[in-house]
Amino acid sequence: MNDNINIAKTYDPKEFEERIYKMWEEGEYFTPKVDKDKKPYTIVMPPPNITGKLHLGHALDNSMQDFLIRVKRMQGYSTLWLPGQDHASIATEVKVENELLKTGLKKKEMGREAFLERVWEWSEEYRGRIRDQLKKLGSSADFTRESFTMDDNLDKAVRAVFVKLYEEGLIYKGNRIVNWCPKCMTALSDAEIEYEENYGNFWHVKYPLVDSEEYLEIATTRPETMLGDTAVAVNPNDERYKHLIGKKLMLPLVNREIPIVADDYVDVEFGTGAVKITPAHDPNDYEVGKRHDLEEIIIMNENGTINELGGKYSGMDRYEARKAIVEDLKKEGFLVKVKEHIHNVSCHDRCNTIIEPMISKQWYVKMKELAKPAIEVVKSGEIKFVPERFDKTYFNWMENIQDWCISRQLWWGHRIPVWYCKDCGETIVSLEEAKKCSKCSSENLIQDEDVLDTWFSSALWPFSTLGWPDKTEDLEYFYPTDVLATGYDIIFFWVARMIFSGLHNMKEIPFKTVLIHGIVRDSEGKKMSKSLGNGVDPLEVIDKYGADALRFMLITGNAPGNDIRFYEERVESARNFANKIWNASRYVMMNLDKNLMEKYKDCKDYNIADTWILSRLNEVIKEVTDNIEKFELGMASQKVYDFMWNEFCDWYIELSKPVLYGEDEKAKGVTFNVLFNVLTSGLKLLHPIMPFITEEIFINIQEEEKTITTSKWPEFKEELKNEEVEKKMSHVIEAIKAIRNVRIEMDVPPSRKAKIMIYALDGIDAFKDGKIYFEKLASASEVEFLNSKEEAPENAVSAVTKGAEIYIPLFDLVDLEKEMERLNKEREKLEKEIERVDKKLSNENFVKKAPEAVVNEEKAKGEKYKEMLEAVLERIKSLK
């Protein structure tokens, strides 16, 4: 056995993945230095929440980012992929609270300080887990620069931005409608809400007019909110109610007079066309209330019970009150009917409690002014969305933006940097802890109890992680970042906020490209969730198949912005591909003769197969690089796969064997070099997708470079492109395939050689150059070239390809009837194909609407099939 083989006989990723990652860390290959002679390339990793382990969505997101980073590192950029984690305020608080409840401890009983100590312990544990998981995936991130949204320097950035916005008049405290969780007793962002289909009711209720027998019938799904009604709205164009606009109604059970107002918000076709308006407990009603200057009556406590304004229902839970109110409406004759109704109900995604829209005094950011420049940078193309269609999603939100509620009634998170003087009531907003009242000099101060929305700190991620507000070397060199890869579900909540935060605080965009990916669904297309039990743990997949196989499955065939389905069979196929590369590499290592390689390293006397594979490699380098630049990572990955499996492993390695096992020293030396160069170039193209296997092979097949991670990315070379040889070689390969298929159909074993006679349809040179390959790969005892079809023997089996007609005198080996049967099957197959093409081309819609190239391709197929059919019919005729 050749002593060049330094890799194990069988492919086992468990044997080397951990060792390889350790080698990378020790080599500091992922820790870039500020190098003014190199261009920087930066990606900040979307920080995973410290609420548990990573899922397949994280695996997809990070595989895509790692793909880009590894390519740019090999292209000579100073690449920084900055990792980190998000403190995930409410999500983490709920998790820790639930863990404590298992031991009988309650958050409120522990007190803020003791509870936060437990959360910090949790964060340390889960940050470590996330870090380990990212490394197992092969992420080439710089963990020496890892950030956490609760780090001191990030907290400093958060306070600096809050104070700046407050001083600019862009942060204020006021009453607005919020999503309120009665269980967690905090305001929530829209991102923390899930919608569940709910089987409820529409209660139709009479609202009588004051001093009249008339009434309006309204329909509501939340009768308990009647207690806070301050109007009923109708559409100004609704003929049924025009005469009632401006009149008063008596609110049932409450006996409060409320007006009938006209508002375009009301849909004439929906329900009864009359809508009860509860400004304090519905976001749409809130807007109607503002337009008509209606009173805002809050009828609930923070825990979801009815407050003192609810009269006899005071103290009841909201659903208890609902039952009591419906019963009373029925008793007093106000309930008209009850209709079953299916509708979506908003729930807190962490505790599954139904949300109560409620007016609450919170801290807000004024958004209109901040949104304008953020819209402009996308419109101008300074920031690009990939795919472009997602900029519409972005514009839709930004152009209809509301003020952002940034306060949360929680303990875990960035405490709002606001203090209140207990003596004079002054509000002090300060970067540092306030010690003395700026108005009365009192030291009797108390800090605001609330923390900031998690997204507030996340919005600063691209620059706070690089040291801002300090002017650091990293910030100057690596900002703005290049690409943000993220899911389409957080364009509103995170991407948009990073854009306006970067523009407002850095006066620069935070990134140049937003690469959007979809979500990973199960094999049936369902969203993965704990409740459905269809989630897949990426670590379990890695343990079974290796990280490279999982990465390859997630990236290959995946188009930007589209959801993907997870099939374990595809991961297994990816592992089979890795195994193929492993075995091909062992073949190359086993046969390489370093002395001959060195002797003929500058020799360019390539045979047709050498020229062909170098030309194909060159074209693939161009296609892969172009696709990466367009962020078509799935397409790039597929191109590498097709080349390495179908062209290099399946064909070139086989084509190299006659040379390597021959006697021509120079030919062997040249082919050794081609084998080596094509394999190492292929490994480099594959490296961003499958980093572990490519590194293990690379460091064992050559000695000049310590790692593939910093080796040079392959470049397109015009002089290696040879379309003529590619065409010739495709004819040879098609002919060999055809001969093999015939032999298989005829049950002729490879050991039984037979003469092959070739009539070339498109020049005979290709087939003459490939003569040796017919002998070695098609079991040819002899190869004869015919000048015309008439020279073909009558007693021969035939095969037709697009470049040749091939005849094999096999009648002493095969059954004549069997050959006729085979030819008739081929005839039927070709007739069906011709019928299909003719039908397509006779379809006017297809010819008019399909691209010209597609129509021409169909025409060419039709001509080819007709030629092949003609040849088959001739053979049938000759055998009769």
Swiss-Prot record:
Gene Ontology biological process terms in this record: valyl-tRNA aminoacylation
PROSITE patterns per the UniProt record, alphabetical: AA_TRNA_LIGASE_I
Entry EC number(s): 6.1.1.9
Enzyme class: ligase
Compartment(s) where it occurs, according to its Swiss-Prot or TrEMBL record: Cytoplasm
Reactions that this protein is recorded to catalyse: tRNA(Val) + L-valine + ATP = L-valyl-tRNA(Val) + AMP + diphosphate
Chain positions recorded as ATP binding sites: K530
Superkingdom of source: Bacteria
Keyword terms: Aminoacyl-tRNA synthetase, ATP-binding, Coiled coil, Cytoplasm, Ligase, Nucleotide-binding, Protein biosynthesis
Segments carrying motif 'KMSKS' region: 527-531
InterPro entries xrefs: aa-tRNA-synth_I_CS (IPR001412), aa-tRNA-synth_Ia (IPR002300), Anticodon_Ia_Val (IPR033705), M/V/L/I-tRNA-synth_anticd-bd (IPR013155), Rossmann-like_a/b/a_fold (IPR014729), tRNA-bd_arm (IPR010978), tRNAsynth_Ia_anticodon-bd (IPR009080), Val-tRNA_synth_C_sf (IPR037118)
Coiled coil residues, start to end: 717-741, 810-880
Subunit-structure text: Monomer.
Sequence similarity: Belongs to the class-I aminoacyl-tRNA synthetase family. ValS type 1 subfamily.
Name assigned to this protein: Valine--tRNA ligase
Organism, as annotated: Clostridium tetani (strain Massachusetts / E88)
